[in-house]
């Protein structure tokens, strides 16, 4: 342990010099609007009528939106809009969460239901759908598309009624109100809210995740924007052509039937709906490092710290929906918001049109996962294939297919697997670990008796520190050897059974080799030669 702490302190000092330069508040990216040539490739879509505050009440849009220093809709404008809709529609209920942001801002959300259901008493045999936006505060089409959906539902009562025959919907339009206020990606404390889903460093993350776990949705969406002007090619004169990038949850500990439902039904329909709206799309990607001259793009990964996968590990269909918007201020905002609205409407309509298949597949997947004795996946890899990706030449706005290497996660390939334990045993000295699991919606039983008997233990054979300081820690790659031993644990120890719906979140958090495990993030610090203090029951 001494070596770990010493290295951590050294890394803290070094990290202060190599980390991104952040201040308290207003960590805003530079604005680089599209040239007239590029802008011509993203024209307004004829017939667009968006029912959200930035478009129905343009006088409420702050001046800073035009130069990239503010979003288009202040908290009070958003709340007033939501309250008015709720007063006019009996099936819309306005709520304020019983928690606040790091700077004390409110979290308003809407609950949509044709019955008298609630989060605590959901409708029987209906889909539960969670929709969130505004996770990153400088991605305004995310929360605006959520507000546009609410306005669209209110303006189309027959469509709303058809949806609510089959589902109850919770809409949390603004996940990060402090970030929106400062028009920055991060929380007020400069943690990335979309990288905190396993380590749970911030109370705000825990509060929202507890609300999510209580609602226990079948379907969820996470609305974001991506950087518009990221350039590629030898001359840096090509950019992504897409209006929309999207991805389902990819972690291999999500039931395969649920993952296939996401890919084969929802993703295919979404692509068609985006094209039908006169927009362009591709799978969500990030740029990778490559030893070849060809551009390497990585499909959305499997890491559980990302909201898309963390939500999916509760065994539900999840989509990350991104629109083209970071760094261009108010440019093309109608088209951007429309892109988000088209994606979320596609998900809702697909679920209703295929209700029996969707509901039964997810419910069967939950039962199959809960009762499974299959091995769990600790690490995986992304096979690389050749394909093309839609690009735009910034010189003449030509649209073309650009050849790339593509690291695919549809599906990823398992590398390290381990037998699924019947349960985990956690000593009473680790109540903070149990609390984190409970935030995930994982149940833990406190034993009134001491446990004496055989367990599987993990002996740490290697700990490798990352080269970068990341959100308060130096992450580690841990290797272990599984051994059997007898143990005596005192009364008050915790038993975490794995025959429960959200157990996959326990797998990724408690198995040390996982990239986002508690051991990786130093929540449970270990050194080479240690025995990991969480035990497995066969």
Swiss-Prot record:
All copies of domain Peptidase M14, residue ranges: 71-351
Enzyme's top EC category: hydrolase
Compartment(s) where it occurs, according to its Swiss-Prot or TrEMBL record: Secreted
Keyword annotations: Carboxypeptidase, Glycoprotein, Hydrolase, Protease, Secreted, Signal, Virulence
Binding of Zn(2+), residues: 136, 139, 224
GO CC aspect terms: extracellular region
Molecular function, one GO term: metallocarboxypeptidase activity
Residues annotated as signal peptide: 1-21
Major localization listed first in the record, in broad terms: secreted
Cross-referenced Pfam families: Peptidase_M14
EC number(s) stated in the UniProt entry for this protein: 3.4.17.-
Cofactor(s) required for function per UniProt: Zn(2+)
Function: Extracellular metalloprotease that contributes to pathogenicity.
PANTHER family: INACTIVE METALLOCARBOXYPEPTIDASE ECM14 (PTHR11705:SF83), PROTEASE FAMILY M14 CARBOXYPEPTIDASE A,B (PTHR11705)
Similarity section: Belongs to the peptidase M14 family.
Protein name in the entry: Carboxypeptidase 2
Organism (species): Trichophyton equinum (Horse ringworm fungus)
């Amino acid at each position: 342990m001494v070596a770990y702490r010493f290295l951590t302190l050294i890394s803290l000092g070094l990290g202060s010099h190599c980390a991104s330069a952040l201040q308290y508040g207003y960590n805003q990216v530079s604005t680089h609007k599209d040239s007239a040539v590029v802008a011509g490739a993203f024209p307004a879509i004829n017939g667009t009528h968006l029912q959200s505050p930035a478009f129905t009440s343009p006088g409420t849009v702050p001046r800073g939106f035009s130069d990239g220093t503010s979003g288009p809709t202040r908290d009070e404008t958003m709340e007033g809009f939501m309250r008015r809709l709720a007063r006019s529609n009996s099936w819309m209920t306005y709520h304020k969460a019983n928690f606040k942001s790091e700077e004390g801002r409110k979290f308003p959300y809407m609950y949509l239901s044709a019955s008298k259901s609630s989060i605590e008493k959901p409708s029987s045999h209906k889909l539960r759908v969670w929709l969130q936006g505004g996770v990153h505060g400088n991605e305004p089409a995310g929360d605006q598309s959520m507000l546009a959906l609410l306005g669209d539902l209110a303006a189309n009562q027959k469509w709303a009624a058809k949806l609510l025959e089959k589902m109850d919907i919770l809409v949390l339009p603004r996940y990060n109100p402090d970030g929106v206020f400062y028009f920055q990606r991060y929380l007020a404390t400069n943690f990335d809210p979309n990288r905190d889903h396993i380590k749970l460093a911030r109370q705000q993350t825990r509060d929202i995740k507890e609300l999510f776990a209580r609602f226990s949705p079948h379907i969820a969406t996470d609305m974001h924007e991506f950087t518009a002007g990221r350039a590629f090619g030898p001359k840096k004169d090509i950019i992504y052509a897409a209006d929309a990038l999207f991805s389902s949850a990819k972690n291999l500990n999500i039931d395969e039937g649920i993952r296939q439902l996401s890919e084969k039904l929802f993703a295919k329909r979404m692509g068609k709906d985006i094209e039908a709206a006169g927009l362009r799309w591709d799978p969500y990607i990030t740029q990778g490092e490559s030893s070849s001259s060809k551009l390497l793009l990585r499909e959305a990964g499997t890491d559980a710290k990302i909201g898309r996968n963390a939500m999916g590990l509760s065994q539900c269909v999840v989509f990350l929906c991104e629109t083209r918007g970071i760094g261009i201020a108010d440019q093309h905002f109608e088209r951007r918001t429309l892109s988000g609205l088209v994606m979320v409407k596609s998900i809702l309509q697909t679920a209703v049109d295929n209700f029996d298949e969707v509901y039964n597949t997810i419910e069967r997947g939950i039962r199959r996962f809960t009762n499974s004795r299959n091995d769990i996946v600790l690490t995986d890899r992304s096979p690389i294939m050749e394909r093309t990706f839609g690009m735009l030449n910034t010189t003449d706005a030509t649209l073309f297919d650009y050849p790339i290497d593509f690291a695919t996660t549809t599906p990823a390939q398992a590398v390290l697997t381990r037998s699924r334990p019947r349960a985990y045993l956690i000593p009473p000295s680790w109540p903070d670990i149990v609390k984190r699991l409970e935030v995930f919606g994982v149940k833990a039983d406190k034993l009134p008796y001491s446990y004496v008997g055989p367990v599987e233990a993990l002996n740490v054979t290697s700990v490798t520190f990352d080269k970068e300081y990341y959100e308060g820690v130096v992450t580690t790659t841990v290797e272990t050897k599984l051994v059997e031993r007898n143990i005596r644990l005192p009364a008050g120890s915790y038993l975490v059974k794995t025959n429960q719906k959200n157990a996959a979140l326990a797998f990724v958090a408690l198995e040390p080799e996982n990239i986002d495990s508690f051991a990786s993030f130093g929540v449970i610090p270990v050194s080479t030669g240690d025995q990991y203090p969480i035990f497995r029951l066969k």
